[in-house]
């Protein structure tokens, strides 16, 4: 839930998935 959203945001911001 929250962890998934946070990881998604970091992925979008840093472009590092």
UniProtKB/Swiss-Prot annotation:
Reported tissue expression: Expressed by the skin glands.
Its annotated compartments are: Secreted
Q: Name one GO cellular component term.
A: extracellular region
Q: List the disulfide bonds.
A: 11-17
The yes or no answer to whether the keyword Transmembrane is present is no
Its BP terms in the Gene Ontology are: defense response to bacterium
- Tagged with keyword Disulfide bond: yes
Give the keywords, sorted. Answer: Amphibian defense peptide, Antibiotic, Antimicrobial, Disulfide bond, Secreted
Q: Which family does it belong to?
A: Belongs to the frog skin active peptide (FSAP) family. Brevinin subfamily.
Q: What does this protein do?
A: Antimicrobial peptide.
Q: What protein name applies here?
A: Brevinin-1DYe
According to its UniProt entry, this protein's organism is Rana dybowskii (Dybovsky's frog)
């Amino acid at each position: 839930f929250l962890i998934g959203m946070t990881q998604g945001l970091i992925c979008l911001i840093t472009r590092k998935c």
